[in-house]
Amino acid sequence: MKLNFYKLLFTVGILVTISCNKNLDTKPTQSIDQNSALNTSSDVLVALTGAYADLGSAYFYGGYPFVASELLANSGELNWSGTYQQFTQINNKAIPVDNSFVANTWLSGYTAINDVNNVLSALSVVDAAKVNKVEGEAKFIRAATLFDLVRLYAKSWNDGDPAANDGVPIILKPTSSITAESQVKRAKVADVYAQILKDLTDAEAKLPITNGFYASKVSAEALLARVYLQKGDYPNAASAANNAISNGLANGFSLKAVYSDAFPYNVSANTTEDIFAMQVTSSSGNNSFQTFFSANSRGDIQIDPSHIDLYETGDSRLNLFYSSGGSVFTGKFDYLYGNVHIIRLAELYLIRAEANFKAGTTTGDSPLNDINVIRTRASLTPLTSLELTLASILKERKLELAFEGAALHDIKRNQGNVALLPWNSPKLIYPIPQREIRANPNLTQNAGY
């Protein structure tokens, strides 16, 4: 989806870093009149395609933040042997403020946000038959981007007072040059979540129930479920997950019968399990999971036996592990042009199970039935009601979603530990990039940096 042709049309309208060998706080000030740049419906559709391209940057939904989440949450179940200093620092929980991966994730996120702000500012020229869909897709992208930014660069919702803790800047208007107005302060965590939920609620109302591989009503409901779960709003998390499951099953989505088929090799299309995925082909897109997890590529991340030991005998998910050169790797990401799975249907069953269990409800179905849907697909014996505990639910989630980028956020939500570090350690939060603080004096740094 990362089409350079479309990106070029927007580069002059965004604040981007000129060159990695120049001062990193220097950004271009050239701009174009956004009203003349987006003066037809076709212009806006091209802009929206560019937003998906930037969302799929290697430093964003192309995978780097998800790989980093797994490394930052790593307590020994992964072995990092790579030469990238930036990921070594993340794996060691010793991130300097000038870590370029951290800086580029921030930049990529706000580039995508600026893209969709351009789109949203020009809705008046969009064909009436398309305007709701365009607005919904743009707001989905903005919400998704803000959600991952606030989870990485700020305290988690349950760490102190979200109304007092600094989150990330909320930018809702296009930025084409550096002005005092563009130097935005960090909004509070609670305000960032409120904006995310507002955008997703609007997107859910405006998007078609299915939309090819673009954002849809079902993907908005799925992301709503993820957001509500992360902020501990369990009734709404269960409800949103149930909506996504019900609408998904009624419109062609389904769990693959065999777990490994959710991660196909030599297939570039979405599976029926992909609620939302970034598209990767031989000519466009990024799949950083493949880069770092696959023995077919760099293979910098190997799976430790301590992780393998967590699976029960007969668990079909074990079939995706393989040995190469004396190390064990996951086969989830072996295909170079495999799509990046952002939200799978399986996660929604896990969200509904956890949320219902914590809320003491059975919205849509019981936690026991939902967990057993996952276990049955993995060729495991169903749990009994006596065996169902929060720990058993979280274990199924850990194994089902292993290495897909959920590890750090799951630990924080459930107040676990990362080795000797508590869940709310400042070392488990990204620093605000130093180049951004130099460029914007209104930004404050996180504690511990």
Regions found by a protein language model. Give the residues of each.
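Acidic, glycine-rich segments characteristic of secretory precursors and extracytoplasmic regions
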Residues: 20-69, 439-449
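Hydrophobic-face positions in mid-chain alpha helices that act as interaction patches
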Residues: 43-46, 61, 72-89, 197, ...
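Conserved, well-structured interaction surfaces
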Residues: 84-153, 187, 200-210, 335-345, ...
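Short coil/linker segments at helix-helix boundaries
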Residues: 152-194
